Amino acid sequence: MANSITHNTATVSASLNEDSLTESRLPTINDYLELCKIKVVALLVLTALVGLALAPDMGRGYFVQLLSLFGIGLLSSSAAVINHIVDSKIDAKMVRTKNRPLVRKAVSRRQALIFSAVIGTLGFSLLVFAANWLTAQMTLFALVGYAFVYTMFLKRATPQNIVIGGLAGAMPPLLGWISETGQLAAQPWILVMIIFTWTPPHFWALAIHRKADYAKAKIPMLPVTHGTDFTKTCILLYSLLLTVVCFLPFLIHMSGYLYLFVAMLINIIFIYKAVALKLSETSYGALNLFKYSILHLTLLFIALFADKFLM
């Protein structure tokens, strides 16, 4: 692990010495927004909002709560930028990522690194002053887990990269909860478990669709190392496990019947799509399942939020 991280750190450091042509033009706002993976971060912030909303009301006020969510979003964006920096050479080899800002030299690595440091520092500071030290520390822990442990090591080291590294991306509901209460509790870990269980089938579906890309980039995603059919089986098994985990908020009285109805409906569809993918002799359904999984998680957390305030 140490050798892998050292190699990637050296690669990033060496890459900072880019030609002056790249830095002679200023990146656009859209370039920086693309580095932040805004759509991904928006979903993370949504899950953090739900964690905050389900926490006991500590009377902190909406503005302070908004600042806390903004801080979580900024640190998540900072991690996304680091991911772009570390993965730029891999991104250049893959169809899905070959037009990212660092690959097309719209942003230099130095500019990206400075940007990541600035928004990361701002996000951490917001969490310290608007939330509490525990939230700031836990969010920083999640950033390190995703940007360094997962991106620099796990992603390149094992086909279980998504399973192990998925914990960092599953943390926002817990972060939202502790930003309100300042304490760890059992309930938000249920929400973490949902995202943690959702992550493997979500990314494995994409990995099936982009199997050739990952193989070309020498990333040991499960379809590359164990084959497409085995990965389809794993997706199906995880979809069943996800369904069970999604019922936990209702079973422990974190939610009511509105959430239960939505969870049942969207998980039945998830399982149906996973079964269809497994039985298919092709991989055409993989992209469809990947896209649906994003809608699934979005609707699930919206249902949790709505159940809290409408029922």
Swiss-Prot record:
GO molecular function terms attached to this record: protoheme IX farnesyltransferase activity
Transmembrane segments: 38-58, 62-82, 113-133, 134-154, 162-182, 188-208, 230-250, 251-271, 286-306
Catalytic activity line of the entry: heme b + (2E,6E)-farnesyl diphosphate + H2O = Fe(II)-heme o + diphosphate
GO biological process: heme O biosynthetic process
Pfam families, per database record: UbiA (PF01040)
Key word Cell inner membrane present: yes
Pathway named in the protein's UniProt entry: Porphyrin-containing compound metabolism; heme O biosynthesis; heme O from protoheme: step 1/1
Function: Converts heme B (protoheme IX) to heme O by substitution of the vinyl group on carbon 2 of heme B porphyrin ring with a hydroxyethyl farnesyl side group.
Similarity section: Belongs to the UbiA prenyltransferase family. Protoheme IX farnesyltransferase subfamily.
Protein name: Protoheme IX farnesyltransferase
Taxonomic path: Bacteria, Pseudomonadati, Pseudomonadota, Gammaproteobacteria, Alteromonadales
